[in-house]
Amino acid sequence: MFTRADLEAREAALLPPFARRSSEARRAVPEAPSETRTAYQKDRDRVLHTKAFRRLEAKTQVFLNAPALGDHYRTRLTHTLEVQQVARTAALSLGLNETLAETVALAHDLGHPPFGHAGERLLDSLMRGHGETFDHNSQARRIVTLLEERSGEQPGLNLTLDTLDGLNKHGRAALPPTQRQPSLEAQVVDAADALAYTAHDLDDGLRSGLLHPEDLLELPLWRELQERSGVTSQRPSSADLRTLQRELLGWLIGDLTRSSDAAIAASGVASPDAVQAHAHRLVTYSPALRGHLRGAGDFLRERLYRHWQVEREVYQAEQVLTELFGAFLTRPALLPPRPRSRVGRDGLPRAICDHLAGMTDRYALETHAALRG
């Protein structure tokens, strides 16, 4: 039987000095260590058992109400699990703390509202009308520190400070000296997130028929992928798509780990603090592949995320959330007891926003229909 002390000793023996170690993890509220689990393993398990994590199953990735389109389109939950798998693979390859990377990956999208990025933009717009903002990264941190509860004694999950730091997104590869870079484990999750949604949104777009293989030929990423995979058909079969998806993931993960390993070695960082003080991120793709991914992201925005059929769904989502927000704002008594109890602490607009952000697509539509009668 391996005890927590055994697992921590194994980390000390195997992990390089720039990786995070669970034995050094701290929490805002100290608690007794587990006999069998490391601090990061406890964090991971707490995230997995939250209501917010379970609700990801019925939240949009790209296509609203994806189950109505078919059983194989990705939801926010399947995307999260795919990010977890990529992050764990890359972290292991780079000698990082894979449990911390896995935990941050599982928690990184907890703050997404219903209806995907359309819902996020709409809630942010509504909150700005009340002098506040909304973004899913801040909401994820709010969920694990305030809204979810393990016990009646304190709000939140009391996750380690390392996990909480991993939920703070930093949008630029180079930061001002006053800001610290994320840990390498958190950087891996950011890279895995971009990798997963690029690869899998292309796949879902093709399967939906909103994207066509011939359209993708304008992408250098796709042309090189065809050469690598040997799949050049303009009408790829389901088996061809699986081959392309497998080849794309292997290519991206391989490039990420090789480029990051070289960048870490060249940087000379010898501690987690040195990583966070570094001027640039060290988990990165090769310059060529970074260009390919930027091109793919631009392509997806124009051809898939702004496709007229997707835009119709976005319009419906905006109407639903706008009307729900307005109804709860004018008649707070319509709020269920739990969000209503938070009005005194957080203010009415934020209590409404938290309630709406926690909804699944299905529950938002059902609530909207019920209020309209």
Curated annotation (Swiss-Prot):
Transmembrane segments: none annotated. Keywords: Hydrolase. Pfam families: HD (PF01966), HD_assoc (PF13286). SMART domains: HDc. Gene3D superfamilies: Hypothetical protein af1432. It comes from the Bacteria. The keyword Cell membrane does not apply. This is Deoxyguanosinetriphosphate triphosphohydrolase-like protein 1.
